[in-house]
Regions:
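Catalytic cores of nuclease domains that cleave nucleic-acid phosphodiester backbones
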Residues: 1-57
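Metal-dependent nuclease catalytic regions and adjoining charged, substrate-binding loops involved
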Residues: 61-69, 74-156
Length: 156
C-alpha cells in the first residue's frame, strides 16, 4: 500500500473484440514494476467471528458469490496487469483483521470465461431486446461443494 510507484483508481477503457462492447475498469491500487504489474482491490467484509481454519473457505465463497473473480480477470485483461490481489478488511466492531488474497491463474481464467460469457449474453440481449429473467423455472436447491465438505466434516 505504501509502495512509491503505487497508483490509485486509474481508469482504463477498452472494447471487447468479440462483441464490440465497451469495457471500463478502475483498480483500487496498481503497481507497475519492471518485471510485473499487479493490482489490488480493497473489499470491506462483515463475516462475523470466523475461525482461522475456515477463513480461506469463507473468503473464497465471498469471491465466488460476489463475482469478484470476474472483475479481477477483467481488470487484468483491460489494464494489462499480471497479478491480482484482494485486500479484505473485516469491518465488524471488536474483531478487526486484514487478509491479502492473491487470485490464482485458474481463478482468473474462470473469471475470464464467466465475464466473456456475460458479455456475449449482454450483447445478445442488446441485439434482440430480449432481457431474460435470472430464474425461468423452478428448481431444487442442493448442497454445493463447500456445504458438502461441511456436511462430511460434521458427519465424522
Amino acid at each position: 500500500l505504501n509502495h512509491p510507484d503505487r497508483k490509485s483508481e486509474i481508469s482504463y477503457f477498452g472494447f471487447d473484440e468479440e462483441t464490440g462492447l465497451e469495457i471500463r475498469v478502475r483498480p483500487d491500487i496498481e503497481i507497475r514494476l519492471p518485471y510485473e504489474s499487479i493490482c489490488a482491490d480493497v473489499k470491506s467484509v462483515s463475516l462475523g467471528y470466523v475461525r482461522q481454519e475456515r477463513l480461506k473457505d469463507r473468503l473464497h465463497r465471498e469471491i465466488i458469490e460476489r463475482d469478484y473473480h470476474l472483475s479481477a480477470a477483467m481488470y487484468c485483461d483491460v489494464a494489462n496487469l499480471d497479478k491480482f490481489f484482494w485486500i479484505f478488511v473485516n469491518k465488524d466492531a471488536g474483531y478487526h483483521w486484514v487478509a491479502v488474497v492473491e487470485a490464482s491463474q485458474e481463478l482468473l481464467e474462470l473469471g475470464r470465461q464467466e465475464y466473456r460469457r456475460t458479455l456475449r449474453q449482454i450483447n445478445e440481449a442488446l441485439e434482440t431486446n430480449n432481457w431474460p429473467a435470472p430464474i425461468t423455472e423452478s428448481y431444487t436447491d442442493e448442497l454445493n461443494d463447500f456445504d458438502l465438505r461441511r456436511l462430511e466434516a460434521l458427519s465424522i
